[in-house]
Amino acid sequence: MRRFISTMAQSGPRRFAPLKEVVAGQHHELPKLQGVIFDVDGTLCQPQNHMFGQMRDVLGIPKSVDILEHIYSLPTPTQQEEAMESIRAIERVSMAQQVAQPGLTDLMAYLDSRGLRKGICTRNFEQPVAHLLTKFLSGSVFHPVVTRDFRPPKPDPAGLLFIARSWGLTRRVRDERDEQAVRDVIGVGQGGNSAAAPREKKQQQEGAVGPDAHGHHEEVGDASGLIMVGDSIDDMTAGRRAGAATVLLVNDVNRHLSDHEHTDLVIERLDELVDVLDRGFVGREIS
C-alpha cells in the first residue's frame, strides 16, 4: 500500500483553525486552512451515475474494471482516442442535465468571503466542468482545474499535489526515509502512465521538484493544509494519500464510505461546511 505524503505523523483527528478567528486576525495554535479542492460530478453537481453504466456498455467492460485504466491500456493511441471520444460523447449529453448540489452557491460565496483558494480535481474532461462553472458559478474562481487530461488520475494523489504546488505549498524532502515515502506516493521508478512523459511534464504532474541525478527529490507539493471534498472512494483515497483532510458529500449510493478509514468528515449538504469551517474543522477519530 502506498503511503501519503505528510509533514509529520498524524495523531488524533485532523483539525484546522476556525476561519472566523483567522479572518479576525486572532492567533491560533491550530494550522490555518490553505485551500479547498473539489471533485465535480456528485460533488459540485448532483450525481449522474447513469453515465458510468453507459460508458461501460459502449466500452464493453464490466463494473469491476476502471474506465480510464481500461482506455489507457488499449494498445494504440488511435484506439485510446476513439474510446475516449466515445465516453466524452456521453458526458456532453449528460452535462445538459447537470443540477447544482444543494448549498453550492452559499458555500462558494462563503469561501470567497474568507479569501480561501478553490481548486478542482476531477476525472471528467474539461467541457462538462466548464459548463458547470459557467452555469452555476460564473462569479467564483477555481484554479487550477485538473481534469482527465492530467495523468495519473485519482485515486493517485498527483493531481492534488500539483494543485498544492501551484499554490506555493511545498515542503523539503527531509531524509532517505522521507524520500522513500515520496516515491511510494508518486510512483517514481515504478512505471505507470506518467513514466513515459518528458521529465518536465512528469515533475509538474507529480507536484515535485526532482528527482535529481541521484534520484532524490528536493521538494514536493504539501497538501497537509488542504481539504479534498468529494463523493467517491477515489476522492477520499487521493486526498488521504496526498496528506489532505477529506470530506465526503454523502448520498444514498456512497453512504458506506462514511466509515471508511480515508474519510475524515461526512456532510449531507455542501453548505454544512460553512459552519464547520467557521468554528474550526475537526475530523473524526480514526483508529
Summary of predicted features, one role per range:
Residues 52-56, 88-91, 129-132:
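Hydrophobic alpha-helical core bundles mediating ligand binding, dimerization, or RNAP-core interactions
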Residues 1-34, 109, 131-287:
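Asp-based, Mg2+/Mn2+-dependent phosphohydrolase catalytic module
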Residues 44, 118-121, 228, 266:
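Conserved SAM-binding loop
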Residues 4, 10-70, 76-79:
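Active-site neighborhood of HAD-like aspartate-dependent phosphohydrolases
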Residues 93-120, 126-130, 157:
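Short, acidic loop-to-helix structural element flanking the phosphoryl-transfer center
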